[in-house]
């Protein structure tokens, strides 16, 4: 008997992803350190190997390592851009007809293969450039945006009422906060006690368990239409996929199209900033003046992950006195303040305190996704989340590439510049939300917008 709870799959995947990101960043940093300096990276119980005297040759060496690590991360992200975009768009768009489980299964297979390859690389000390190839191959199966997009569409399929939907998403954010917080807290101890190879192996086992749950225990609310598969060729299916995407923006009134485009723009730009700055945080904390080791980075990651928990509480409390659009404003402006404060942080205590200003960072992402789901028909949820995941994949790779490039170019004269730049970029989603408000967004207006749509959502040819 199959069940319809997507939450276990999301939490297991979140554990794997949350542990993989800091592990990979530190693994790349250490490998480049050892290859550049020809000696083994060591870490004390308090701080990492870090020289704070700018006149020292070691300080210049550290800056060189940070530049190389940032540029290598840029290469890795770019390698997965094109296959990730194509696979994400096609898998999620086709999930309206073929079910939500297929994107989850394939993206989990890609994650499993990538972590097994990282395990082999760290165990056998294989060339670091092979990470670029594994990222490219893994992206062919989809990536994290593919998995999250399918999960959000799965929840929307089950929860027809908007209030129930947003509560379930908020509860999910709460659970994600607990899992990612504990994972981030333990990531440093994983590295110190188990090393990179065994840590990646544990992640691979978790992904394998998650894959088994999705395949054998999770039900699919979208039933596969066998007649459509028989009568439609591959080219016709691809044509139908693009046609439904085109109709998503063509159907409905001018107000609906304007709201849809503005909300997608707001979500993508905000995601661009928040996701792009994440790997820079690790590099910023590893270098002077903070000079954190893997345990402190784990503490920082855990504190940052509390934004899922605090965002859940924020949505729950603010929903009693604020409208959706105002809740999104709170998250954007508090994140903007946090970026500006981080740029001027020079001590460990201040860095921990600055993390508090990021406690509502996830709120706009949850709210904007819920707002978007209100302006499209239930049969278009897969296409909508395919577009969102496609743009998030493009924005995610572009942002991490851009931020890594900017950080490597500015780390020598001012490491905090990227955070000031992020604060400035957050003005764009704030202005976009103002335009949404001016057009006339109302909490219950989505019903009228959906009724504006034609009943046909698929191609007749």
Swiss-Prot record:
It is found in: Lysosome membrane. Coiled coil: none annotated. Its main location: membrane. A motif (Tyrosine-based lysosomal-sorting motif) lies at residues 446-449. The keyword Iron-sulfur does not apply. It catalyses: estrone 3-sulfate(out) + n H(+)(out) = estrone 3-sulfate(in) + n H(+)(in); 25-hydroxyvitamin D3 sulfate(out) + n H(+)(out) = 25-hydroxyvitamin D3 sulfate(in) + n H(+)(in); cholate(out) + n H(+)(out) = cholate(in) + n H(+)(in); glycocholate(out) + n H(+)(out) = glycocholate(in) + n H(+)(in). Belongs to the major facilitator superfamily. SLC46A family. PANTHER family: LYSOSOMAL PROTON-COUPLED STEROID CONJUGATE AND BILE ACID SYMPORTER SLC46A3, ZGC:174356. This is Lysosomal proton-coupled steroid conjugate and bile acid symporter SLC46A3. It comes from Rattus norvegicus.
């Amino acid at each position: 008997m199959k069940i319809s709870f997507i939450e276990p799959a999301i939490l297991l995947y979140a554990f794997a992803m949350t542990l993989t990101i800091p592990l990979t960043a530190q693994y790349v940093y250490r490998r480049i350190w050892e290859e550049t300096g020809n000696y083994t990276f060591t870490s004390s119980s308090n701080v990492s190997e870090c020289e704070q005297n700018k006149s020292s040759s070691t300080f210049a060496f550290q800056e060189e390592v940070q530049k190389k690590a940032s540029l290598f991360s840029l290469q890795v992200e770019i390698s997965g851009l094109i296959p990730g975009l194509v696979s994400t768009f096609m898998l999620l768009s086709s999930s309206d007809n073929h079910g939500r489980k297929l994107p989850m299964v394939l993206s989990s297979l890609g994650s499993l293969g990538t972590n097994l390859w990282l395990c082999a690389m760290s165990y056998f000390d294989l060339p670091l450039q092979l990470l670029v190839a594994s990222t490219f191959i893994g992206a062919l199966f989809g990536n994290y945006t593919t998995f999250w997009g399918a999960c959000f569409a799965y929840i929307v399929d089950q929860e027809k009422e908007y209030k129930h939907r947003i509560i379930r998403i908020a509860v999910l954010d709460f659970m994600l906060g607990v899992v990612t917080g504990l994972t981030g807290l333990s990531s440093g101890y994983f590295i110190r006690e188990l090393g990179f190879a065994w840590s990646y192996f544990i992640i691979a086992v978790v992904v394998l368990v998650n894959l088994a749950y999705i395949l054998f225990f999770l039900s699919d609310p979208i039933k596969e239409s066998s007649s459509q598969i028989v009568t439609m060729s591959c080219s016709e299916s691809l044509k139908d996929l693009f046609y439904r995407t085109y109709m998503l923006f063509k159907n409905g009134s001018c107000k609906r199209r304007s709201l849809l485009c503005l909300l997608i723009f707001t979500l993508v730009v905000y995601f661009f900033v928040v996701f792009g700055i994440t790997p820079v945080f690790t590099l910023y904390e590893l270098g002077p003046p903070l000079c954190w080791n893997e345990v402190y980075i784990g503490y920082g990651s855990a504190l940052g992950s509390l934004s899922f928990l605090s965002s859940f509480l924020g949505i729950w409390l603010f929903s009693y006195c604020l409208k959706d659009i105002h809740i999104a404003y709170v998250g954007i402006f508090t994140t903007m303040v946090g970026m500006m404060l981080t740029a001027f942080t020079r001590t460990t205590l201040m860095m921990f305190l600055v993390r508090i200003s990021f406690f509502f960072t996830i709120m706009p992402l949850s709210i904007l996704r819920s707002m978007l789901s209100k302006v499209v028909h239930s049969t278009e949820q897969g296409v909508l989340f395919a577009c969102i995941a496609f743009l998030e994949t493009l924005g995610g790779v572009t942002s991490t590439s851009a931020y890594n490039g900017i950080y490597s170019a500015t780390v020598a004269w001012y490491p905090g510049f990227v955070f000031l730049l992020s604060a400035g970029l957050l003005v764009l989603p704030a202005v976009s939300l103002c335009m949404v408000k001016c057009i006339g967004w109302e909490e219950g207006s989505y019903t009228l917008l959906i009724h504006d749509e034609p009943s046909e959502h698929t191609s007749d040819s």
